[in-house]
């Protein structure tokens, strides 16, 4: 028997269990999985400033790139689309996968650390791979 849980849940519940992380090549996570978004009214300047102080720029960049893929592919909450970006000092790593229930297409690539279009480029690569594999999703 097995169950899939977020690692944060295991940590938060202080569970002493044996577990392993899923390889994103096997199961690409949902876009922006695990990212907490907070919004505030523009006229609440003290709240906006407090949020800016705790904002994680790397995570924000990763979420932005993942959203680029979702928009370019035409995905949404019910799309069988996984996207993951990791930004570090050496560059940007992106992986995206999509499935029709029988077949799966996964693409990945490295980008320059300042490439703000990495999400668009990965989406284009995924579309090309989908076309090559004959993978067409119903709208």
Functional labels for PLM-detected ranges:
Residues 1-139:
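Small-molecule-sensing regulatory modules
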